[in-house]
Regions:
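Glycine-rich beta-strand-turn "strand-cap" elements at beta-sheet edges
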Residues: 32-41, 66-101, 105, 136-147, ...
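A mid-sequence, solvent-exposed acidic-amphipathic segment
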Residues: 112, 120-122, 130
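An amphipathic, aromatic/His-enriched active-site/gating alpha helix that lines ligand/cofactor pockets
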Residues: 16-30, 48-81, 128-135, 154-180
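Short amphipathic alpha-helical/adjacent loop interface patches that line ligand
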Residues: 14, 18, 120, 124
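Short, well-ordered beta-strand segments in beta-rich or mixed alpha/beta enzyme
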Residues: 1, 30-59, 97-107, 136-166
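Short, surface-exposed ligand-recognition loops at beta-strand->loop->(often short) alpha-helix junctions
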Residues: 1-10, 107-116
Length: 180
C-alpha cells in the first residue's frame, strides 16, 4: 500500500518510471499504474514484458532503480503476482483525464476453466473490434492460483465503460458464465 499522504508521490514516480521504461527498454511492452477510486492508498502496477529476459533487463535498468530508491518512502507494502497471459489486446492509448482503468478479479471454479476461457476471450476480441471506447483488454491467470483470473481494462471514458456493460456480447458473457 501507499503510505498516508503519499499518493501524489506514488503517481509521480510511477509516471516517470513508466515513461522511461516503455520508451527506452526493448521488451517492456506496457506498464500502467492505478489506484483504487475508493481507497487511494491501495495501488496497482500492471506490467507486461516480452519475456523473462526483458523483465530481468527492466529490473537492472535506471528507471526501475530510480523507482526502487524512492519506493521505501512512498510504499509501505507490496505484493508481486505473476500472471500467465490469456489475452492481450490494445489500441493506441493516449491516457487523459477521462480515461478509466478497471482491474477485475474473478475466481472461476476449476471444472469450468476451459469453458470460461472459451467464452470470455471471444468477448474481449469482439469488444476491442466493435467498441471505439474500449482501448485495452488484458487477461491473465494467477501463476500460483490458476482459478483466479485478472482482467485489466482501459476505457476512453466512464460513458464508454457503461456502454460496454450494455452490449449484447458482454451481457451474453455474464449470462453464460454466472454459474462458473
Amino acid at each position: 500500500g501507499i503510505r498516508p499522504d503519499r499518493d501524489n508521490d506514488f503517481a509521480d514516480v510511477a509516471r516517470q518510471t513508466i515513461s522511461a521504461s516503455v520508451d527506452h527498454e526493448a521488451g517492456t511492452l506496457a506498464m500502467y499504474a492505478l489506484q483504487r477510486s475508493d481507497n487511494s492508498g491501495q495501488a496497482f502496477m500492471f506490467e507486461l514484458y516480452e519475456n523473462e529476459r526483458a523483465y530481468r533487463k527492466h529490473l537492472n535498468a535506471a528507471p526501475y532503480k530510480a523507482f526502487a530508491a524512492r519506493a521505501p518512502d512512498i510504499i509501505d507494502s507490496k505484493k508481486k503476482i505473476t500472471l500467465e497471459p490469456q489475452f492481450l489486446g490494445d489500441k493506441h492509448i493516449i491516457p487523459n483525464e477521462r480515461t478509466i482503468n478497471n482491474l477485475v478479479i474473478v475466481e472461476v471454479k476449476p471444472e469450468f476453466q476451459s469453458e470460461f476461457r472459451n467464452i470470455v476471450l471471444p468477448e474481449m476480441v469482439e469488444s476491442l473490434k466493435v467498441e471505439k471506447g474500449v482501448l485495452a483488454m488484458y487477461a491473465g491467470t494467477d501463476s500460483e492460483t490458476p482459478k483466479r483470473w485478472y482482467f485489466y481494462e482501459i476505457y476512453a471514458s466512464e460513458e464508454d465503460y457503461q456502454l460496454h456493460r450494455q452490449t449484447l456480447h458482454f451481457l451474453d458473457y455474464l449470462r453464460q458464465t454466472a454459474h462458473m
